[in-house]
Design a protein with these regions (language model features):
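Signal for well-folded cores of large energy- and translation-related assemblies
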Residues: 14, 32, 47, 64, ...
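Long C-terminal interaction/binding lobes of large macromolecular proteins
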Residues: 2, 103-104, 131-138, 144-210
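Cys/His-rich short segments
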Residues: 45-94
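Conserved phosphate/pyrophosphate-binding and hydrolysis machinery centered on Walker-type P-loop NTPases
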Residues: 17, 36, 49, 61, ...
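Short Cys/His-rich Zn2+-coordinating modules
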Residues: 5-11, 33-57, 69
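Extended interfacial segments that mediate partner engagement and assembly in macromolecular machines
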Residues: 24, 77-151
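Extended, structured, electrostatic nucleic-acid-contact surfaces
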Residues: 1-17, 29
Length: 210
């Protein structure tokens, strides 16, 4: 039986996805055995992350507090293609696409996928902000935008895609926006976190128009 402070720490470490009872207890004991200076460095790093990491004002990926215009490194990178946007469900999915090392566009984090059965609707996503972003990109005559879907293709994914198409149609943007999905070789309910680099490269290169 762990002393209460250790037990409480182990319990709170289970807030992290995938951390169960045994692994949380091991982590708690590992923290207890850290040298004082390393323990202090860890606490400082945790505090710094909470204070200094925000979400990009344009795409929703991680950005550093005080960054120019509130944008992340990707959105500020002039070498990337702003009219090629990869749609992801959560910020960590950006890291999965980036490890392909071939995607040079921008991103847009949806935060949620539409799922009426789970009481998740369009207002719980950033689709509205995405459409406004697209309108700005299309201000230039003849400009086009490609949206690359990188989220699961189950019911919630299809509902999100359908709503996005409706929004684009309502705004008269559908003729200038191409929507593509990653290669059909991916499992329908794939977990973005588990995709390796080779799989990501093939999926991006073989993407198909929706």
């Amino acid at each position: 039986m762990l002393p209460k402070p250790l037990f409480d720490l182990a319990l709170k470490l289970q807030y992290f996805p995938g951390v169960g009872v045994r692994s949380s207890q091991k982590l708690a004991l590992d923290l207890l055995e850290l040298e004082p200076d390393k323990y202090g460095e860890l606490l400082e790093a945790l505090s710094s992350v909470r204070a200094q990491i925000k979400f990009c004002a344009q795409c929703g990926f991680f950005a550093e507090e005080g960054a120019a215009s509130g944008l992340c490194d990707i959105c500020r990178d002039a070498r990337r293609k702003p009219k090629q946007i990869c749609l992801v469900e959560k910020p960590t999915d950006v890291l999965t696409v980036e490890k392909s090392e071939i995607f040079k566009g921008h991103y847009h984090v949806l935060e949620n996928l539409i799922s009426p059965l789970d009481n998740v609707f369009a207002e719980h996503t950033t689709l509205g902000a995405l459409v406004e972003r697209i309108k700005t990109l299309l201000d230039t005559p003849g400009a086009t935008v490609e949206l690359i879907l990188f989220f699961k293709a189950g019911f919630s994914g299809e509902a999100t895609t359908a709503y996005l198409k409706d929004l684009l149609s309502e705004r008269g943007l559908e003729e200038r926006v191409t929507i593509t999905r990653l290669a059909q070789g991916l499992p329908m309910y794939y977990n973005p976190d588990t995709l390796d680099q080779a799989t990501m490269v093939r999926a991006l290169e073989d993407r198909r128009e929706v």
